[in-house]
Amino acid sequence: MSYVLDSTATRHNLDAMAKFYLNYETTTYEEVAGKGVKQITFNQVNLESGSHYAAEDADITFRCYELLKEKLSQKPELEKVLSEIDLPMIKVLSEVEQNGALIDPEVLRIQSNNLGQRISGLEEKAFSEAGKEFNLASTKDLREIFFEEMNMPVMKKTPGGQPSTDESVLQDLARDYELPKILLEHRTLAKLKNTYTDSLPEQISPKTGRIHTSYLQAVTTTGRLSSADPNLQNIPIKTEEGRMIRNA
């Protein structure tokens, strides 16, 4: 209901809604259970604190529901979106999540090995281009090689006044220099390997043999679905490597 009324809001959890709609500060879970390594489970919380927390949650949930229901009743077009699209979609998405996505781990393993070989080859090319070995992930090393040893132009600086080596700078420099081009390709392949070909097989459920992502209805400002744990919607489609991962 909160999302349908305002999809641009950054948060739609109970704490945020209580603050925005009721001007009420809720008791946080950390206040009753602690945080970090010292956080306890809810069944270990003392009865008085736990009862207050649970009762407050129920009370604020009901109050927000009544208020949002009233607001929606004043906007029939949004009320229709909720009743005819968003709520029925919950059951559909639940079934999709439970069914999961069938993944072939052997295909991903082969792709991971291939990517690993290409990444190693790019590292050797980078070392050859620079005339020495260096840490491709080290901003300090890149600054030293780019701007001190190879005299590349400084395209922009960081807030701290240091020459930037972010992706936009690498893309600009790659027009005239080989090393930034190699680094961009290395980063692209390393991300594919770490995020997908290495990670996805580890997220296959041993019970179903499938990956069960979560589809989120109330996150994007445009109303489209998003995916998390893992994000299966973010696998690249424009590159050959991304399409190969999708084929798995």
Task: Enumerate the language-model features and the residues they cover.
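Conserved catalytic alpha/beta cores of large enzymes that bind or transform nucleotide phosphates
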Residues: 244-248
